[in-house]
Amino acid sequence: MLTLDTLNVMLAVGEEGLIEEVVLTLLASPQLAAFFEKFPRIKKAVTDDLPRWRDSLRRRLKETEVPPELTEEVECYQQCQRLSTPQFMVQLPQILTLLDKVHSPYAAQARKLVTDNATFTPALHTLFLQRWRLSLVVQTTSLNQQLLEEEREQLLSEVQERMTLTGQLEQVLVENENSAGRLWDMSAGQIKRGDYQLIVKYGDFLAQQPELMQLAEQLGRSREAKSVPKKDAPMETFRTLVREPATVPEQVDGLQQSDDILRLLPTELATLGITELEYEFYRRLVEKQLLTYRLQGESWHEKISQRPVVHQDFDEQPRGPFIVCVDTSGSMGGFNEQCAKAFCLALMRVALADRRRCFIMLFSSEVVGYELTAEQGIEQAIRFLSQRFRGGTDIASCFRSIIERMQGGDWYDADAVVISDFIAQRLPDDVVAKVKSLQRDQQHRFHAVAMSAHGKPGIMRIFDHIWRFDTGLRSRLIRRWKR
């Protein structure tokens, strides 16, 4: 079949001018003018998309087939161009019949041209073909304009949908022209309004927690390298205060909250035998909130130890991608869940602004991943925000997934961020050793975002930096009071 693009070439119809006219008409539409005025940072991203629009229109012209009637008329015209005047006169009745058959706009004019001239001269032959070609050019141009107008309407509809989406998410995710451009690129997917409202919802929550946004920016833009002990470094004296509780019964000095089973109050011990309160007992045991006797004799003393001399390097480090692990255990539900999701959204904003990748992994009984800065990043973010935190805590699997990803070529300079309350089992020795190897040999940095003041120190000791955001009621009230 004859395509419209081929017909344009045959008749020397200037399709580039028609395409440019469509693009300029689209840019001059009132909708785009109002959008550019409201969101000036996205204007450059939209104008950078113009080559893609032009390519789309060219591709549409190449793929569109010419109607069968016009194809038949064009083939007849091409055959007539090769005929001499006597041969053309012989074929003229069949030509006029074909023009009537295909309902050509030139049919009436052709018959009039023949009937008005008794003698068919070579000049009349040339005039007949010239006017026929002009009719074909008009038909082709009209077909081009009709097709491009349909494409313009479709393109305008697509752009309006993307403008609506981008306008809604601009305040949440756009920090500079880099992020504006990437947001516009990601808006090309088929996203429903009700879906992306979830991002707007967590963006509003993030706006109510400015400390969380500030924490994400500090973590995302921290370039300071960690202290690394040099090989064969000299030892230095290191003094720490160590608390040593009394190990023998002494005089009771009062009550305190701790996890000392040997000094429990009888009332606390009684709850262990009640099925309905057993879970509450273990929770308070983990959080060191059980009421116990406080004995005299507990004291602090100075412990002296030796450690290698370390040198703190303050050179700026290159910014690599984020690998963010989010704890989805039951203890991370409620307000913790909101904070964790909003924090990931804030890291996505930083990653878009700095042209970095941001990969989210949820860990409970299994590990699920979402790349928020990919081409389908908005859909990935919506899926992530739709998850519910109701699983268990398998932080070891989380670290193994991080280690495996860091060993890939695309993530060689990644920063790992673990968001959790860190109320979990201790890490296996092989995982700890592998993490320390990555920190020491490849300068990978591991960040902890602690959502609780009761995280296990043994787990958190492995991180280069601990960013604390206590979600307890007291801390929330203090933060609100300070604003």
Curated annotation (Swiss-Prot):
Gene Ontology CC entries for this record: cytosol
Intrachain disulfide bonds: none
The keyword Hydrolase is annotated on this UniProt entry: no
Domain of life: Bacteria
UniProt keyword list: Chaperone, Cytoplasm
Pfam families hit by this protein: VWA_CoxE
Localization in the cell: Cytoplasm
InterPro entries: Uncharacterised_CoxE, Uncharacterised_ViaA, VWF_A, vWFA_dom_sf
Broad class of where this protein is predominantly found: cytoplasm
Oligomer status and interactors: Homodimer. Interacts with RavA.
HAMAP family: ViaA
Similarity remark: Belongs to the ViaA family.
Family matches, as PANTHER family: PROTEIN VIAA (PTHR36846:SF1)
Role: Component of the RavA-ViaA chaperone complex, which may act on the membrane to optimize the function of some of the respiratory chains. ViaA stimulates the ATPase activity of RavA.
Name of the protein this chain belongs to: Regulatory protein ViaA
Organism: Enterobacter sp. (strain 638)
Gene from which the chain derives: viaA
